[in-house]
Amino acid sequence: MVSQHNEQVIAVAKLFDGEQWHHNVQVHVSNGKIAAISPADKGLVTNVALVPGFIDIQVNGGGGALFNTEPTVSALKTMVQAHAQFGSTGLMPTVITDSVAVMEQAADAVAAAIAQGEPGILGIHFEGPHLSVPKRGVHSTTYIRELSEAELTVYARNDIGIKMVTVAPENVSAEQIKQLVALNVRVCLGHSNADGATVQKALAAGASGFTHLCIAMSPLTSREPGMVGVALTDANSWCGIILDGHHVDVTAAKLALLAKPKGKVLLVTDAMSPVGTSQTEFPFFAGKVTRDGSKLTTEHGSLAG
């Protein structure tokens, strides 16, 4: 690698640009961004592959830190470092259903990290608290609630990067979704038992994505499309999907890839604190979560990220 001031040239054996592989190339970096790609002398290249980093929009924790429990800049740094080991270079730290106080602390931490120029923090994802109790998954019923001014004040902030909020459209009206969109919030649908018509209204109001497709959402049946059916057939929205071998069957994942336009299916981890550690259990609200290999479950056997 050749470096001069804010200019760098990196010669590699293989480069993936997101569409195709390039061989024996040098990458010209200017002020932290790729400016050009050109052929390189084979004698100069290093025998490595250079690929774009992963962007994960649903990250609850990592490195032993859980963002709900530790809504701090220090925890964010720990999470970023843990996920960087596995190729993720941009994260949306995720706060699941919790008190307004925790949401405010998490927003403060993200704002401070961004202001300090901490790498890897793209914004914040609030997964809840405006969800469906029947489809809550491991979210605490104690904190599931309607949208109020207290949460809107958090969502209105302009210092927390990209803002994403997952809601159940049967509990958050189309007008409220429009209000969130007007605040530059990316509204996602999930943890919902809504019928197809309600989901369609939410999309028309400005919702643009679905949180962990097939998990904790109304299913596709013969006479009711549910949230899953609408998600698969709507060409404009995107779907996050957890492909860890536990959450979604591979056939369902193939169906999503066949049904959705290119670029509309996103891999997410829904990662918890054990990422990058040997941690085998951790406290989770009033209970605990246990790790068995790559599988996390609550004391009641429910999947937990």
Regions found by a protein language model. Name each.
Residues 60-62, 77-106, 119-132, 159-170, ...:
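Divalent metal-dependent hydrolysis catalytic cores, especially in the metallo-beta-lactamase
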Residues 198-305:
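Active-site-adjacent C-terminal substructures of enzyme catalytic domains
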Residues 126, 132-149, 154-226:
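Divalent metal-binding pocket/active-site signature
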Residues 73-74, 106-109, 148-150, 223-228:
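Charged helix-capping and loop-helix junction motifs
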Residues 1-40:
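N-terminal metal-binding scaffold of metallo-dependent hydrolase/deaminase domains
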